Amino acid sequence: MSDYIIKVGKRKTAIARAIIRKGSGKFLINGYPIELYPIEILREKMLEPIRILGDRSKEIDIDVNVHGGGNTGQADATRTAMAKAIIEYFKDSDLEAEIRAYDRSMLVNDVRRKMPKKPMGYGARAKRQKSYR
């Protein structure tokens, strides 16, 4: 078994790389502890794979480097990368089934992208108001 495992998670334009290694339960996002992440809802979302892992989370350290996108996209990308890394590190099919049952999007990148702007409009769907007079 190698010293560490790297996994990637994506959401919209956010890309997260999670590095998992044997450790003492430290979880860093861009070098800062995950507990210091400012938005509580997103912090809880990022901690879901760790909560599912339970007590075994004290055996590992996860360092996530995330860039691009906004807060929510980065949180989802981080969550996906962490879940994938945890599954590959422990190689436990029961754990994978538990994560998949909890939320499949933790293991599958969301492929939806922003729809491009169309001519004669302000965005993908909105159009200029039509005047008859």
From Swiss-Prot:
Listed InterPro entries: Ribosomal_Su5_D2-typ_SF, Ribosomal_uS9, Ribosomal_uS9_archaeal, Ribosomal_uS9_CS, Ribsml_uS5_D2-typ_fold_subgr
Assigned keywords, A-Z: Ribonucleoprotein, Ribosomal protein
GO cellular component: cytosolic small ribosomal subunit
Pfam family, one: Ribosomal_S9
Domain of life according to the entry: Archaea
Alphabetical GO biological process terms: maturation of SSU-rRNA from tricistronic rRNA transcript (SSU-rRNA, 5.8S rRNA, LSU-rRNA); translation
One GO MF term attached to the UniProt entry: structural constituent of ribosome
Family per record: Belongs to the universal ribosomal protein uS9 family.
UniProt name for this protein: Small ribosomal subunit protein uS9
Gene designation per UniProt: rps9
